[in-house]
């Protein structure tokens, strides 16, 4: 489900999707959202409900699914995957470690693999000075830090930033 609320009118519209909605981002196209579904990326117009498939389909679907995503300071969309933990009938299945991938999606359809071997992709954010990228693997109970080049959107090798949380697991992040 995707709920769209208009604060000016108080109206809320709900849009149904047949796969999980895992993340979304504004685009440079008026009235269009970039929506990360479990199966891949689409452009979506919430005003009329029109969905446009993008060439960025998840190759491992339905055995893998997208899980979390966010736009970087340049407006490039990053999204991570994991082993699908929901069977086609809706029942839970075990999560398999190491089957997730971190992708960078650029307008025009370029989907680049940035890292592999991830358990559960979660918690993407960038430092305020735009020099570092943080990315979490919930299954490994770890957040990694990567050098980030804001000129081209590339990352360097990641190193552990924080690991082995005693309470809770990394899932969602923000820096202010």
Question: Model-predicted segments: where are they?
Answer:
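Beta-rich, blade/repeat-based domains predominating
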Residues: 1, 18-34, 60-76, 83, ...
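Short, conserved, GDST-rich strand-edge loop motifs in beta-rich repeat architectures
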Residues: 79-97
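A short beta-strand motif characteristic of beta-propeller blades
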Residues: 10-16, 52-59, 109-116, 158-163
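Short loop/turn segments immediately following beta-strands, especially the blade-tip
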Residues: 47, 146-154
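Short loop/turn segments immediately following the C-termini of beta-strands
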Residues: 38, 82-84, 138, 148
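Flexible "stalk/tail and boundary" regions
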Residues: 7, 29-31, 46-47, 103-110
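A short loop-to-beta-strand structural motif that recurs across blades of beta-propeller domains
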Residues: 1-3, 40-42, 94, 100-103, ...
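Beta-propeller domains
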Residues: 1-17, 38-43
């Amino acid at each position: 489900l995707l709920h769209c609320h208009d604060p000016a009118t108080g109206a809320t519209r709900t849009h149904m999707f047949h796969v999980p909605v895992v993340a979304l981002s504004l685009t440079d196209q008026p009235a269009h959202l970039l929506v990360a579904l479990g199966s891949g990326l689409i452009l979506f117009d919430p005003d009329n409900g029109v969905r446009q498939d993008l060439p960025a389909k998840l190759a491992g679907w339905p055995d893998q699914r997208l899980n979390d995503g966010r736009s970087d300071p340049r407006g490039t969309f990053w999204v991570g995957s994991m082993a699908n933990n929901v069977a086609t009938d809706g029942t839970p299945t075990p999560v398999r470690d190491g089957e997730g991938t971190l992708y960078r999606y650029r307008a025009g359809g370029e989907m680049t693999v940035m890292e592999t071997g991830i358990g559960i992709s979660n918690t993407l954010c960038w430092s305020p000075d735009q020099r570092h990228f943080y990315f979490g693997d919930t299954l490994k109970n770890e957040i990694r830090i990567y050098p980030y080049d804001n000129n081209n959107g590339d990352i360097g090798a990641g190193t552990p930033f924080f690991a082995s949380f005693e309470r809770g697991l990394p899932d969602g992040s923000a820096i202010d």
